[in-house]
């Protein structure tokens, strides 16, 4: 018993000591179906999309999350809700084990009293006792198995939900370095291993401890001298298991890490399979995958070799123990210090010690895997969101949509992105932003939505510092349409409805699609709005995906609308129609980020960024008269037709 307790505590105290997570019960409402497989992959891959569209800030989760640095033996943080069920399950297990202990005693009575003593009238009662014990053992065994299966499912599901919910609270800076494949491995594979350890393996550990305790008690009751032999055997196996775990610890950490790498490679390759084929890189991708797959194979073979090296010792001790007991017990019978029935019972008890000793190697293996997985998961739980609501965060009664940047500077990973940015947009007005790639255009929107906080200066919405507003209200007030559209594997209707939390009717959905110039191609499809689009919108053209994304934004009807180069894949005619539609949104503040002059020439003011600074600002006509960067961009885009286009753009701006 002492050896098994030592084994269990060694893994869950020493290997997973420092963190345990307590989460608000509200996370239990997250459907389990949102976690595994492609759904989890889409949600993790679409973090930006979720933040842009969500009417509720992810920070709504993080305020309820507390990371407690406690010993892992206080895992009752998770099992606390089910403590009565655990007690009932352990009680059923104990009852089944007690009944198991009766078999050898009945056998002893049959040998000593019936066979040797000649009391044949006891045989019927003893056989009835065997039947009753067997029936009771079946009932309690079934209840034990069922209870632990249910508990493991509930706790494993809760851990997975809590981990996924915690990931949703993390700031954008975390996802700058994290990758989807690794997070998928943590949420799915690593949680499965912990689930197994807290469920089936945990049940076996408890069962082994109780079983061995009662067996040793019964053995000592028969002969304390003979009982020292199985006690020594258990001590030997326990020490061997601890030594084996130390060898497995590093291996399982490497296996967990390599599994995440393999998942990342597979996820990235499948997501970008068209790019791979376009560049004829299939051979390179196969070789890259095979290289990591070989390392994964080698690590698993190392783990197997360790198991193979140690496992025979557990088996040998388990098989040799009954034989040893038969020999030593036989000597005691010959000397008259032990009855034959007691010897038979003792041998049966020694056989009951066999399977726990043989299981030690297997339990060590699974607990080592779970400990390594827990370390990986713990690092995610210990991550804290950099961006969070202040305790005195303000909730505005009504958001009008005025936006202001006052001396804003921002650096990321030591690189200066924005320097002293100043501008203001009144509600309902339109601001155009142009500049070369990497000039800081998109960073302005990240700061406006508080994906990051500015290093200097102030970003304001309706005159309020965005850091003083709740993230939920701030992000639900700003709708962003990205150039890189993220669509989910669902119907077109559901992809459009995603932008608004309240239920939308088909009339509103069709209206949004019509205004986004998407109704034409949608209604030509066989299933129209019920058409299920593939992962990330596969099967749709870039322009079609952008139009669905614009429809989703229009359905949301936020006070501030940001178009981040979101018409780049549209033809000129469709783009002009959308520009006309945007011009009619008098109650919506519009920020249009683009590379094409045609997308911003109608704006009330245009900013031209260069190296993180505002190099030029003004209306289209004013910037053309300056003959600076904006003017040269116009000339480069329209060439010989620049004169005519300038006239057309002037009319359009008016």
Where are the regions a protein language model picked out?
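Membrane-integrated ABC transporters
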Residues: 1-18, 23-100, 107, 115-127, ...
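ABC-type nucleotide-binding domain
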Residues: 63-66, 389, 396-654
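Transmembrane helices of ABC transporter permease
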Residues: 81, 85-98, 102, 128, ...
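Alpha-helical transmembrane segments
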Residues: 96, 100-104, 132-152, 233-248, ...
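Short intracellular "coupling" helices and adjacent cytoplasmic loop segments at the cytosolic face
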Residues: 116-117, 153, 161-185, 189-191, ...
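Helix-loop-helix
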Residues: 119, 218-232, 302-375, 380-381
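An intracellular "coupling" helix at the cytosolic face of ABC transporter transmembrane type-1 domains
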Residues: 172-173, 189-198, 202, 206, ...
């Amino acid at each position: 018993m002492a050896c098994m307790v030592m084994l269990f505590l060694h893994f869950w105290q020493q290997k997973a000591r420092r963190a345990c997570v307590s989460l608000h019960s509200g996370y239990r409402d997250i459907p389990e179906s949102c976690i595994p497989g492609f759904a989890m992959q889409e949600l993790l891959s679409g973090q930006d999309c979720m933040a842009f569209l969500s009417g509720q800030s992810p920070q709504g989760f993080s305020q309820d999350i507390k990371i407690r640095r406690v010993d892992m033996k206080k895992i009752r943080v998770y099992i606390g809700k089910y403590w009565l069920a655990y007690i009932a399950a352990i009680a059923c297990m104990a009852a089944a084990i007690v009944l198991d202990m009766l078999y050898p005693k009945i056998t002893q009575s049959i040998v000593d009293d019936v066979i040797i003593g000649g009391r044949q009238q006891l045989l019927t009662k003893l056989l009835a006792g065997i039947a009753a014990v067997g029936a009771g053992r079946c009932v309690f065994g079934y209840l034990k198995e069922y209870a632990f299966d249910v508990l493991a499912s509930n706790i494993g599901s809760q851990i997975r939900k809590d981990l996924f919910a915690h990931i949703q609270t993390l700031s954008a800076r975390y996802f700058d370095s994290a990758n989807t494949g690794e997070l998928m491995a943590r949420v799915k594979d690593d949680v499965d291993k912990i689930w197994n350890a807290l469920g089936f393996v945990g049940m076996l550990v408890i069962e082994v401890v109780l079983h061995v305790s009662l067996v040793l008690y019964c053995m000592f009751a028969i002969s304390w001298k003979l009982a020292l032999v199985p006690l020594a055997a258990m001590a030997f196996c326990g020490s061997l298991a601890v030594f084996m775990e130390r060898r497995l610890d590093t291996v399982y950490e490497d296996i967990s890490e390599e599994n995440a790498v393999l998942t990342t490679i597979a996820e990235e390759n499948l997501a970008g399979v068209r790019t791979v084929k376009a560049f004829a890189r299939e051979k390179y991708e196969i070789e890259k995958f095979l290289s990591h797959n070989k390392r994964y194979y080698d690590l698993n073979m190392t783990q197997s070799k360790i198991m193979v090296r140690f496992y025979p010792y557990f088996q040998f001790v388990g098989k040799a123990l009954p034989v040893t007991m038969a020999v030593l017990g036989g000597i005691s019978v010959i000397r008259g210090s032990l009855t034959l029935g007691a010897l038979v019972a003792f041998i049966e008890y020694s056989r009951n010690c066999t399977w726990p000793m043989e299981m030690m190697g297997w339990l060590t293996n699974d607990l080592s895997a779970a400990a390594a997985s827990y370390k990986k998961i713990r690092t995610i739980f210990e991550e804290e969101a950099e961006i969070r609501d202040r305790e005195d965060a303000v909730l505005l009664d009504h958001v009008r949509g005025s936006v202001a940047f006052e001396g804003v500077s921002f650096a990321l990973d030591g690189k200066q992105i924005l320097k002293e940015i100043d501008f203001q947009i009144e509600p309902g007005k339109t601001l155009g932003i142009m500049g070369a790639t990497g000039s800081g255009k998109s960073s302005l929107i990240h700061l406006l939505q508080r994906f990051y906080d500015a290093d200097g200066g102030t970003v304001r919405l309706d005159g309020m510092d965005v850091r003083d507003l709740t993230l939920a209200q701030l992000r639900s007030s700003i709708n962003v349409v990205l150039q890189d559209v993220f669509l989910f594997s669902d119907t077109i209707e559901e992809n459009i409805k995603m932008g608004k939390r309240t239920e939308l009717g088909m009339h509103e959905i069709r209206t949004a699609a019509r205004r986004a110039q998407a109704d034409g191609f949608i209604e030509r499809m066989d299933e129209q709005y019920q058409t299920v689009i593939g992962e990330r919108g596969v099967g749709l053209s870039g322009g079609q995906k952008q139009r669905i994304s614009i429809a989703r934004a229009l359905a949301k009807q936020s006070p501030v609308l940001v178009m981040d180069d979101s018409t780049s894949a549209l033809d000129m005619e469709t783009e002009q129609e959308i520009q006309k539609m945007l011009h009619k949104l008098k109650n919506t503040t519009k920020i249009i980020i683009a590379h094409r002059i045609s997308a911003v020439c109608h704006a009330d003011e245009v900013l031209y960024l260069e190296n993180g600074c505002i190099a030029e600002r003004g209306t289209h006509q004013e910037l053309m008269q300056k003959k600076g960067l904006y003017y040269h961009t116009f000339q480069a885009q329209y060439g010989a037709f620049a004169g005519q286009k300038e006239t057309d753009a002037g009319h359009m701006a008016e």
